[in-house]
Amino acid sequence: ALYEKHGIDLSGLERSKGNTFHWEGEYEVNMNNRRTLETDLGVIEHWMPSVPSSLAESQYVLLANCAPQLQHHVLKQLNSPQFVVADTMDLWLNIARQELEALLKEVDCLVLNDSEARQLMEEDNLVVATQEMHRFGPRYIIVKKGEHGAILSGPKGLFVAPAFPLKTVIDPTGAGDSFVGGMLGYLAEKGGDIESHLRQAIIHGSVTASFCCEGFGVTTTTQTTRQDIDQLSLIHISE
């Protein structure tokens, strides 16, 4: 009912018996820093997603954070999408790096956080790490930096986007998903040339993520309106 209320297409939804994906972590006083304590893949450990024919023509695709081999499996079922974004996390860097590198050869954009970028490239300098990631294949690299915003590296060089400042942070879990979802949703709405809209899309994603952090779970994001997001996305990027 919650998804339908927000107009989300559920035609590709699959249900399986078993435990849901479970992640347990610990945030420091500085919530930019978190430590993974436990990850239980649950039903997705042996899941092979099937893309309905009605969605196979999708032009804007987010390969959400899961095992790289599953992301690749989804990608192979799509018919020439215009823009493919892959999200990942430290777990896959540790246990499926080879599969991740194979996937990156076939996507347009990689999104990950700053600690994962440093881990992937074995490089402490974040600017250097961001730019060197292009050698894996993606034309665009986006590195999330929590309260410090995000870095985009692409054909036009670097772009640094601020995060929306918050007085109160309740739970940052899910902020990364909110960021990339808001960003890609903006791009899909605008259509046309990716380069013309990507920087503004990142601002849009940053604002979307800020609402996620202000509540636990989806309590805040489900009450957020498009008007709320647009009012805070007032930074207009000159391309």
List the predicted regions and their residue ranges.
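Short, acidic/turn-prone active-site loops that include or flank metal/cofactor-
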Residues: 15-17, 88-92, 116, 164-167
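Short gly/ser/thr-rich secondary-structure transition/capping motifs
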Residues: 41-46, 88-94
